[in-house]
Amino acid sequence: RQRQMCIRDRLICFTIKAEEKQIASPDGKIVVTISDKNGQPSYRISYKDTPFINSSSLGLITNIGDFSREMSLEHDVQSSRIDETYTLPNIKQSNVHYVATEGVYRFSQEGKMIYDVIFRVSDRDVAFKYKMYPQKNTLSCIVKEEATSFVLPDGSTTFLCPQSKPMGGFARTSPSYETPYKADDAMGKNGWGEGYTFPCLFRNGDKGWILIS
């Protein structure tokens, strides 16, 4: 996909290209689209062609650079199928068979490889993480801010526990307990002024539910 821009009075014409890649769950119902439109790393998620996460930013701001903008999504994608079975004694379903599609999406800045965003998409969830690359002699960095966001579709409602203010409650241990929540509350609020506690549950109208954790 590309957008063309022209300055007619000077007869100058140039093209801005936006790279987009997609990864789907094994059953094909969940689709994640990764993009670098306008130099901004982003992703969006749909289920059965219905948006569940609108275009949302990706990226990291570190002590060695701002890697949330002026980024380019590389053409090559490493993809693989994950098929794992494991046992955990202390969960509701002790024997788990996990099948997913994995895609490694590499972002660069000024021709230098900066990080991979590694997505795993199963038939029921999406997970992703960042993998930073060393920069010259710098083998570690401090993440000062994360640009990752989650933009819900219009009309979504919330089931969120407000984060407690620190150093309160029993023996000044807050935040340490669950707090009351309001069912189907409106978006755009800030709880008690401290944000909300993960996991966060949302309803996408009559289309389904979204749990972010």
Region annotations inferred by a language model:
Residues Q22-S213:
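N-terminal accessory beta-strand-rich subdomains and adjacent acidic, glycine-rich linkers
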Residues A18-E19:
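Boundary of Sec targeting at the N-terminus
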